[in-house]
Amino acid sequence: MRLKGTIQTLLLSGVIVAVGASCSSQVPNTLTDAEKAEGWELLFDGQTLNGWRDFNGTALTEPWTVVDGCIQAKGAGSDGTGYIVTDKQYENFELSWDWKLTKGGNSGMLYHVVEGRQYQVPYVTGPEYQLIDEPNFPDKLEDWQKLGVDYAMHLPDQAKMKVNPYGQWNNSKIVFDNGHVEHWLNGQKVLEFEAWTDDWFERKNSGKWENAPEYGLATKGLFCLQDHGDPASFRNIKVKKLPRKTREVTLFNGKDLSNWVAYGTELWYVEDGLLICESGPDKGYGYLATREYYDDYDLSVEFKQEADGNSGVFIRSTVGRGVRVNGWQVEVAPPNHDTGGIYESYGRNWLIQIPDEKENILKYGDWNTLRIRVQGDNVKTYLNGEQMVDFTDEKIGKGIGRIALQIHDGGGIKVYWRNLKLTTL
């Protein structure tokens, strides 16, 4: 699914299970008592498409139906259409499903898919377990396009690949456990890797996803099936949630900007162990964002303002074209301008400002400690040990993305940062 060039170049992506043979008359979509006790849940009840809808939609209009206890694609979709997603998001999980391909069929299963107007197709955010009938596929396949791959990223162990031919059922499984990923095929583990490592980012940024900046970064998202132009059948789709693990993260190493991504032409550099942001000649907006997404966390940063000092810390944010940020800013501003308040850029503007009597907590020109606790739909901010706001918002609760530091436009800004650390919750 090479993102360079036209959408025709993406036709080999096999983005979802294009399974075409007619389904068995058996209705196997049930859970054993043991599976129920272990926490498994069905994503398909064997009779309806309840729990599924169009990608970026509110209802189900794409070419899907239920036939003989199976979800079946009608074969009317394409690379850019025909996607359906689960209503619910999943973070850490074990996902198992049965699939069956027609001759030459090409498809896959996606996870951690993110919706939004900026995402026209699911595969620019969600990784894919590739499903394809290799022996009968009409075009030459590269290794990264073959059955069982983490599409265009990681290859399976071919010695462990035991697949039933087209027209027969196979079983696949994806395990995503706090960044540890496994692909299984018919009871054999064929692939495993760690997400968000240096190696992972090197593969992402130098390969097929170099023009998809948000690919694979989401820590939670939707499961997705696609009608890729061939009839497709699925059954026994079930998932078990796995627990989130707490970890301590040092965001800034005091030496360089490793693990950060700069946006815009403003200046970001390291000097004497400090991270410094400074207005550049363009006097525009600038952002320095973590390369990873962070969902729920307790973040602590220290900052010292020089000159104007108008900056901020964005939570669950992405930065798009034209250095346009999507997300929420915890304000870092000059005196009497609501440091610690929460502002939504390009949206609702101020969501909550700090009480006037707390404006004197900021030590302008000296070091300050800003703490931000983000959990679900709630954000709490603290400045120098004093709580500034406690805010709950449904939209924030649905957000995902990076942590980002801001330089405001207008020029004349210089802010020093140090001790940027967080604990995931």
Where are these regions (language model features)?
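Bacterial N-terminal signal peptides
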Residues: 10-20
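Bacterial N-terminal signal peptides that target proteins for export
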Residues: 1-11
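Short intrinsically disordered, low-complexity coil segments enriched in acidic
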Residues: 2-3, 18, 22
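Carbohydrate-interacting regions of secretory-pathway proteins
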Residues: 23-425
